[in-house]
Amino acid sequence: MKNIALIITFLLFCISISAQKPNYTKKTFLVSGNCEMCKKKIEKAAKSVDGIKSARWNVVNGNMKVKFDTNKTTSDAIQSAIAAVGYDTENYRAKDEVYENLHYCCKYERTIKKE
Protein backbone atom coordinates (compact mmCIF):
# COMPACT_ATOMS: atom_id res chain seq x y z
CA MET A 1 0.00 0.00 0.00
CA LYS A 2 2.85 2.32 0.85
CA ASN A 3 4.48 1.54 -2.51
CA ILE A 4 1.28 2.37 -4.41
CA ALA A 5 1.00 5.75 -2.68
CA LEU A 6 4.65 6.45 -3.46
CA ILE A 7 4.18 5.52 -7.14
CA ILE A 8 1.06 7.70 -7.45
CA THR A 9 2.88 10.64 -5.86
CA PHE A 10 5.80 10.18 -8.23
CA LEU A 11 3.52 10.01 -11.29
CA LEU A 12 1.65 13.16 -10.28
CA PHE A 13 4.97 14.94 -9.82
CA CYS A 14 6.12 13.86 -13.29
CA ILE A 15 2.88 15.01 -14.89
CA SER A 16 3.08 18.44 -13.25
CA ILE A 17 6.65 18.92 -14.50
CA SER A 18 5.85 17.89 -18.08
CA ALA A 19 2.79 20.15 -18.25
CA GLN A 20 4.84 23.36 -18.35
CA LYS A 21 2.68 26.28 -19.40
CA PRO A 22 3.70 27.86 -22.73
CA ASN A 23 5.19 31.34 -22.48
CA TYR A 24 3.93 33.04 -25.65
CA THR A 25 5.34 36.32 -26.91
CA LYS A 26 4.64 38.40 -30.02
CA LYS A 27 7.32 39.86 -32.29
CA THR A 28 7.26 41.86 -35.51
CA PHE A 29 10.15 42.02 -37.96
CA LEU A 30 10.67 42.80 -41.64
CA VAL A 31 10.93 40.13 -44.33
CA SER A 32 11.71 40.93 -47.98
CA GLY A 33 9.35 39.53 -50.60
CA ASN A 34 6.91 40.54 -53.33
CA CYS A 35 3.78 38.49 -53.78
CA GLU A 36 1.25 35.96 -52.50
CA MET A 37 3.55 33.10 -53.49
CA CYS A 38 6.22 34.66 -51.25
CA LYS A 39 3.66 34.98 -48.47
CA LYS A 40 2.87 31.26 -48.57
CA LYS A 41 6.53 30.23 -48.51
CA ILE A 42 7.50 32.73 -45.79
CA GLU A 43 4.62 31.75 -43.50
CA LYS A 44 5.21 28.03 -44.11
CA ALA A 45 8.89 28.41 -43.19
CA ALA A 46 8.02 30.28 -39.99
CA LYS A 47 5.35 27.74 -39.01
CA SER A 48 7.83 24.89 -39.51
CA VAL A 49 9.71 26.06 -36.40
CA ASP A 50 8.69 24.20 -33.25
CA GLY A 51 6.86 26.51 -30.82
CA ILE A 52 5.16 28.79 -33.37
CA LYS A 53 1.55 29.59 -32.54
CA SER A 54 0.89 31.96 -35.48
CA ALA A 55 2.74 33.65 -38.35
CA ARG A 56 1.38 36.33 -40.69
CA TRP A 57 3.35 38.21 -43.34
CA ASN A 58 1.99 41.44 -44.86
CA VAL A 59 2.69 41.61 -48.61
CA VAL A 60 2.32 45.42 -48.71
CA ASN A 61 4.70 46.51 -45.94
CA GLY A 62 6.80 43.36 -45.38
CA ASN A 63 5.95 43.09 -41.69
CA MET A 64 6.04 39.57 -40.27
CA LYS A 65 4.03 39.11 -37.08
CA VAL A 66 4.73 35.94 -35.11
CA LYS A 67 3.48 34.53 -31.84
CA PHE A 68 5.69 31.84 -30.35
CA ASP A 69 6.54 29.94 -27.18
CA THR A 70 9.80 31.33 -25.77
CA ASN A 71 10.40 28.00 -24.02
CA LYS A 72 10.76 26.35 -27.46
CA THR A 73 12.16 28.92 -29.91
CA THR A 74 13.44 32.45 -30.52
CA SER A 75 12.85 35.23 -33.01
CA ASP A 76 16.32 34.52 -34.44
CA ALA A 77 15.45 30.86 -35.06
CA ILE A 78 12.30 31.92 -36.92
CA GLN A 79 14.19 34.47 -39.03
CA SER A 80 16.87 31.90 -39.81
CA ALA A 81 14.22 29.44 -41.05
CA ILE A 82 12.75 32.12 -43.32
CA ALA A 83 16.18 33.04 -44.71
CA ALA A 84 16.82 29.35 -45.39
CA VAL A 85 14.00 29.35 -47.99
CA GLY A 86 15.33 32.45 -49.77
CA TYR A 87 13.93 35.53 -48.05
CA ASP A 88 16.02 38.18 -46.28
CA THR A 89 14.91 39.23 -42.79
CA GLU A 90 16.07 41.97 -40.44
CA ASN A 91 18.82 39.77 -39.00
CA TYR A 92 19.51 37.17 -41.71
CA ARG A 93 20.41 37.31 -45.39
CA ALA A 94 19.31 34.35 -47.51
CA LYS A 95 22.09 32.46 -49.27
CA ASP A 96 22.59 33.73 -52.81
CA GLU A 97 22.05 30.31 -54.40
CA VAL A 98 18.72 29.89 -52.58
CA TYR A 99 17.62 33.41 -53.54
CA GLU A 100 18.56 32.79 -57.19
CA ASN A 101 16.29 29.70 -57.24
CA LEU A 102 13.20 31.71 -56.26
CA HIS A 103 10.46 32.12 -58.87
CA TYR A 104 11.08 35.23 -61.02
CA CYS A 105 8.20 37.15 -59.45
CA CYS A 106 9.59 36.47 -55.96
CA LYS A 107 12.99 38.07 -56.59
CA TYR A 108 12.92 41.22 -54.49
CA GLU A 109 15.49 44.01 -54.29
CA ARG A 110 18.14 42.84 -51.83
CA THR A 111 18.98 45.54 -49.29
CA ILE A 112 20.98 43.50 -46.76
CA LYS A 113 24.68 43.50 -47.65
CA LYS A 114 26.75 40.33 -47.86
CA GLU A 115 28.93 39.62 -44.86
Where are these predicted regions, by residue range?
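Processing junctions and N-termini across compartments
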Residues: 13, 29-32, 99-100
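Short amphipathic alpha-helices in soluble, non-transmembrane regions
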Residues: 42-45, 77-86
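Bacterial Sec-dependent N-terminal signal peptides
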Residues: 1-24
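N-terminal targeting signals for Sec/Tat export/insertion, comprising classic cleavable signal peptides
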Residues: 26-56, 60-63
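Conserved short beta-strand edge segments in small beta-sheet-based binding/regulatory domains
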Residues: 86-98
